[in-house]
């Protein structure tokens, strides 16, 4: 009996001793700073200049690659990029055959939105894509990658950006089957011809696998499989319309997004009698969330918002959006279409014509990026949605979006617009965004309707909205209207 107990212990010890004997890197279990004294001992460098203790990667394909293999580790870097610089931190990868996809890649890219690669720093590329700017060019930032068992965490400036647990039988698209964890090399590489990446501090803590091997076996559901497949295609799965309402916190929202494989845009309600109602409250709000790993969005409430803010202040948001659910009818009555006692429908057809005209006026007059809660009609008309949204009315809305370069939201909560409307808009060249418009802390969904639309309408990455660079924001180019639109 004692002999049987000893055998497993001896086997484990043999494995550990074997690993240590083969391992030729920094001391396991301790944090080692990589500097000029030990750089050549542990790392192979290519086209890297060392100046005053800093590593400069200026040439395309400049790299720092480990001479040792690791599976579990903690790696932290203090870095800076100059404009145009893009790179990758690869792990579980190979020293050779860089053209083949093996292991995982963390993106380093601090360019403005819609400039170059859409994936930004902290993105676990093709697995948990991050499209949100987490750092800026010409500023030092901290990047940390942790691999423990089958868990991967990527943090930027102490904010968790990408989080992934690799299933034991990870499903990968053709050509990506090598994208799994293994004991292999780590490499920092520059992938762009322009700009420079600078590393001023690099620390690594190797972890002997057996000390930390807690592999979680779990089954993904069909929806998670769809999301994983879209992430592997680098489809931008972004919910641009999330609110911190009903007790929902920023940490809860970000955790929900990471767990489900997409990004969030968190919107402030800005307008008359709302918490954000002038430049001062707007700037205070933005200063409070500036470090959060979310898109910063402005929901323009009512029609009066154009009189309350300056374009310069509004341009602090990554994008702005509005709906056509609040306006004044031809009898001078103020309508809020989601409120039955504040909605007046004297004649169905006249109401729909008036609504269509209001949508056109809002899109023509207000410098918004996205039309949200689109095609929403009052509760008493919703059963006749397909009848009332005629081809002529749909065409008018689509044309208004096109001529003003406004994206059309696909709303996961209301499940609008209809597939027919979306197909018509796609054929015309309209861009799309996804949004939930949650009202409670427990009604964030998993973008089910949006995923259905991707399949049924054949949406691709090229069909999707991305925020404009700051210099190209509509609010700065178009300004605000001189009169309220509705």
What residues fall within each predicted segment?
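Structural recognition of the beta-strand scaffold that forms the well-ordered cores
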Residues: 105-108, 264-266, 295, 321, ...
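Short, charged, surface-exposed secondary-structure boundary motifs
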Residues: 116-118, 275-276, 329-333, 442-446
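An N-terminally biased module of ancient metal coordination in phosphate/nucleic-acid-related enzymes
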Residues: 221-304, 378-387, 396-397, 435, ...
